[in-house]
């Protein structure tokens, strides 16, 4: 009889209202979609989600048996241990996978966890948030295995927790080429028209968290504007739901003249069009566990500027353009390189294809199968 893997896939149902799954939820959804396409998996897989958002959810038509624990998280996990208790005693499985950093488990459950990074744990330590600290420590010490998405993230996990190096495995995420690819020009223009965006422009898609470093990017863009005498130079488009008021006030002039544009959450189709139409994607982040925007931009045929830190060179390799996260002059030089037509797009197109081919969701799924088999 085959053994059974149970995956708690929280986050995959969030797109029903917004049309968007981001970050951890997106990686879980893409992993499961890739597993769904593999016929020779030597064990059974079951999937479930908790909370009311899963009620009526179709689980993307996956072949895996699926279920919903329809109790609000606050009651099922935070105020009681009802969900972990129910899972342990009534959901028949040999191994539980928690793919979203941390969760509640019942004593004696055999589980593996995917830790994407340690940002949330560091915040909890800084704030003295003991419930979150305990959850992370439970994940690190009580799991039978840990998966992460970059060598950098592995090194950070090992720094935070006293665990054996061999307990932590690394498998890179894939390029979502079913979502991000080169649009034809007409389709791109139709989407940009509906968004009110006109070319040429630089694009930044990951803005909300302070570590995304958008304040420095805006300072660099303002300097770029001062140095550039062309009226129709590249604008800066930022996908950002709720930019802070002080930033809106500080850059009111650029917002008023249309050179800086803030867009709220956009659909995947709109995001693809934004990538495809951009001159360059600007991703000046201070720290990442993986860095999806690099692969998304490459898949859409658009170069990316990012920073020489954390995992970013593992993903962007020798194809991304690297700057210091506080080096405004370097950022301006990259902007001017594109503005003056000095960037070699033909070389980029050849080299970026190599990156896209390497980061495959099928490869990711098969590596995860090996990981699961190790602990089943």
Residue ranges and their predicted role:
Residues 1-376:
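Carbohydrate transferase catalytic cores enriched for Leloir-type hexosyltransferases
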């Amino acid at each position: 009889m085959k053994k059974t893997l149970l995956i708690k896939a929280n986050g995959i149902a969030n797109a029903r209202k917004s049309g968007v799954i981001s970050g951890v939820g997106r990686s879980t959804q893409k992993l499961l979609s890739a597993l769904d396409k593999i016929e020779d998996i030597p064990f059974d897989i079951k999937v479930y989600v908790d909370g009311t958002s899963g009620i009526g959810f179709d689980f993307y038509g996956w072949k895996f048996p699926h279920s919903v624990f329809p109790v609000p998280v606050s009651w099922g996990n935070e105020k009681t241990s009802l969900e972990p208790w129910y899972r342990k005693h009534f959901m028949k499985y040999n191994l539980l996978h928690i793919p979203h950093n941390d969760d509640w488990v019942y004593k004696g459950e055999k589980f593996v966890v995917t830790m994407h990074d340690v940002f949330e744990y560091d915040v909890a330590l800084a704030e003295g948030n003991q419930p979150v600290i305990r959850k992370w420590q439970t994940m690190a010490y009580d799991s039978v295995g840990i998966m992460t998405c970059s060598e950098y993230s592995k090194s950070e996990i090992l720094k935070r927790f006293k665990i054996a190096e061999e307990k932590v495995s690394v498998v890179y995420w894939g390029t979502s080429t079913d979502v991000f690819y080169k649009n034809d020009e007409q389709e791109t223009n139709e989407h940009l028209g509906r968004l009110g965006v006109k070319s040429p422009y630089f694009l930044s898609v990951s803005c909300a968290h302070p570590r995304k470093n958008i304040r420095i990017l805006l300072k660099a863009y303002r300097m770029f504007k001062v140095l550039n005498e062309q009226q129709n130079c590249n604008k800066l488009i930022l996908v950002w739901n709720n930019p802070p008021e002080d930033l809106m006030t500080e850059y009111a002039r650029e917002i008023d003249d249309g050179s800086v544009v803030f867009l709220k959450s956009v659909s995947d189709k709109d995001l693809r069009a934004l990538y495809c139409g951009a001159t360059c994607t600007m991703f000046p982040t201070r720290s990442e566990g993986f860095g999806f925007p690099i692969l998304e931009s490459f898949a859409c045929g658009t170069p990316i500027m990012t920073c020489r830190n954390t995992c970013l060179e593992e993903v962007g390799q020798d194809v991304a353009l690297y700057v210091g996260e506080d080096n405004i002059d370097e950022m301006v030089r990259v902007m001017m390189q594109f503005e003056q037509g000095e960037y070699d797009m033909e070389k980029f197109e050849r080299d970026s294809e190599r990156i896209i081919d390497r980061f495959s969701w099928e490869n990711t799924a098969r590596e995860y199968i090996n990981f699961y088999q190790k602990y089943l």
